[in-house]
Structure formats: C-alpha cells, structure tokens
C-alpha cells in the first residue's frame, strides 16, 4: 500500500494534478526545491526533503536527496524483518512511491549556446540514484519516470485500496532502467564527442563511444525471409516526418519488407515540393512522377513499369483523394502512404481491408546517422542529404541543355539518388521512363533502363538521363544516346571524363556534371 511518495521532477507536466490526487487518497507528499514550491503554491500539504532528513540542501542543490533517510526508505525490503528493524531503529519511514524525472541534459546540449559547463551542470546525480534504487526494489516500491504513467498508477491505486500490483511495478521499473541507460548514453556520447579543445563548439559528429536508444514498436511475423525472426524498433529521437511516426489506418500487420520498402518510398517522395508519387519494389523506385495532383502523379508513375508496380509500395506527398484512391484501387498494392487520406478515399479502401494505409505527417527531419551492420561492427555515416545547387552544376559539352531538358535532368538526378547502384534513370516531362538498378556494371544498368521503357511502351526520344556515379567508359553513354537521350547528368570524376565528354559532343547531346556522387547500396 502506498502511504508516502517522494516527488522531484524537472518535467512538471501534470504533476500538480497527480500530486493532488495522491493527497486526496491520503498519501503523504515529500518533495524538493522547485517541485516542492510548485506543490505548496497549489495548496498541497508537502514536506521538503531537507525538513524530512534534517539535513539542508547544499552545494548549489547538488546534494538534496543523497541521504540514508531517503534511500533507506526506498531500498528496504518489506519482507525482511532485519530491514524493517533497521528502519525502525533509525526512525526511517518507508517511501512507497517515487516520482522522478531528470535534468534536461539532452535539451541542454541541443542549444547552440550550450557550454561544457552548462552540460556538466545538467548531469543529474540524485535523480538517477533514487530511480535506480526504487527500480531495484520494485517489489515494494512503485517508481514513475514518465508523466504518461500518472493516470495508470492512480487508476490502479483507486481500484486496489492504494496498492499497486507487482506486474505494474515491474513494468515501471523496466522503464526506469531504459530511461537511465538512455540518459547515461547521451552523456557518454556528448563527452566522448569533445575534441582536444574540450569545447562544446568543437564536438565531433562521431563520439568515441556510440550509444543509441530504441523502443520496440512491434514484433514482426518474420524478417526479410520467413526463416528469420524480426522486430521493429523506433528511435527515441525519431525526427519529424520519419516513417517510424506512422499511423496505420487499416490493413494487415506491416511486415519487415513492408517497412523497409515504405521507408524508401517515403524518403524519396517527401523531397518533392509539388504533388508527387513514388512506387517502390524491393527498395528501388520502379515509377516516380510529379503531377497536378496525387491522381495525376500516380497515373504517370504507374506508366513507367506496370509489371513491377504489382504488389508495390506507393507513397504520396499530398493527400490521397477519391480520384487517386480509385486509380490505385485498380491495382494490387501492399502499402499506401500519404500525409492524409480524404474520407472518400478511406471509403474506397474500406472494401480492401488487406491494403495497409499509413498516414505520416510531412517533415524535413532526417536521422542523425545512417547505419549499416557489418560482422562485429557498425558503419556510421551522415545522411546523403546533399542537394546540388544550380550554381554548382557544370555544363561540360558544347551544347547547352534547354530549359525543359534542365528540368528533366534535375528531376532525374533527384530520383537517381534513391535507386540502388549502379543506377541509370531515364526521365521526361516529370516522370521516370526507365530505371536500371543494382547492376555490377553501369552499361548493363543503361541497357536494362532502356529495355524497361521499351517494355512499357514509352519513348525515350528526347529523354534526360541521370547516372548516380561517373561513366567509367563511353560505352554506357553510347547506350543511352542510342536509346534516344539528348542530355545527361552525372557526377564526373572518372579518369576518362575527357573521353566521355568528347563522346557526348560527338553525339551532339548536353552533359552536366554535379561533382556529387550518390552511391546507394
């Protein structure tokens, strides 16, 4: 039974109402510093920890709760007579409920004007110590680190005469250890990122020790293949607009491959400023287009490769309305992603309950790192978020691209970044015409992209081509020109750039170098 609670929080969301409810249930309240003042100002009967222990706060508040009368009351096992006798001998009442959250270290170091001294002062000592003590003794003590659990605790107390069951205490204790691990991980990441100057402004992007925290969203039926087990975890620092923030409106459970392909589709489509549609199959775009609205963009994207689009993942960067929904509903689709779906669109898919509809708010946030596991290690790099500015583009051929060709080239370049290397992408009039992906030689990707367009009945005459990396020889260029391309955009940087540029001039096409490579593996 909970008779006494100690409350000390930095995040004061809902704390006054929670404390009032505890007081109404007859629970004695202990508190510290600003939290105690807040509760007292709200008219609640609260005892300062300094008065409770008989020892004042000291060292600018660094020492407040590090006292036997606090930790003895938390750590004592109620089932051990010798523990209870020790409490009685030293006049230490039990503390049955601990409500603590920590100094805002992560928020502090995120500030541009943060100094190392600011960071150090926001490393909580007493809070984690109390939390770990209470979590260790969760058999007898309820510990709350998340304001979202206030209502859960109150409901159970009211239903059980101020008592909390073991299952709830255990769950809350595991949240504490996850929270303190994340907190210590953030401190370690920060301190080990400091360079020799030991200044906040001179931090390295890659700390000497890397700690990351993820919460499990769900177990998955299986992994990439049926014999593999899998689960999906959400980054606790997931940025705005990230796939992990999806809301599923209908459909079967997402699979491992659904999630991976959905991420590829969403990351690509949200880079466009105008209505766009991206169709993904096996992590590669098989159709990308912009249009007047979602329905128009989908119709164009689907034309690129109707065969591969079967059972694909489709993403939009605008609301899916009834017209777009009716067009998509004619095909077999695994997942449909958009910032929103109109009520009429939802009605269209109500009859297709296996189709997974995901809503994700548009946002331009990116993961802090791109990660790739290797045997016994982890490759960590910054995101490939480089957008080439017009001033960085170099026309290296005698012929300049026309305004239309320039638009087509920039569209193709945007798409090529999301195609597995080696990537060749034919585009025209705001849509992909042929995509060659994942080949060991660039010339084979060029041939495949050309064949794909041919199979779809699309003409490549006057098309624009993007290559994610340089042409090592002129053969790839010869293939795309023979297919009908009149302009090419590529990074450049080959030992044979001069030979490739000369070939472009020989063919009378325009070529632009970006100076940026977009390998994707």
UniProtKB/Swiss-Prot annotation:
SUPFAM superfamilies: Cytidine deaminase-like, Methylglyoxal synthase-like
One protein family per Pfam: AICARFT_IMPCHas
Record key words, sorted: Hydrolase, Multifunctional enzyme, Purine biosynthesis, Transferase
EC number: 2.1.2.3, 3.5.4.10
Entries under InterPro entries matching the protein: AICAR_Tfase_dup_dom_sf, Cytidine_deaminase-like, MGS-like_dom, MGS-like_dom_sf, PurH-like
Positions of the MGS-like domain: 1-145
Protein name: Bifunctional purine biosynthesis protein PurH
Lineage: Bacteria, Pseudomonadati, Pseudomonadota, Betaproteobacteria, Burkholderiales
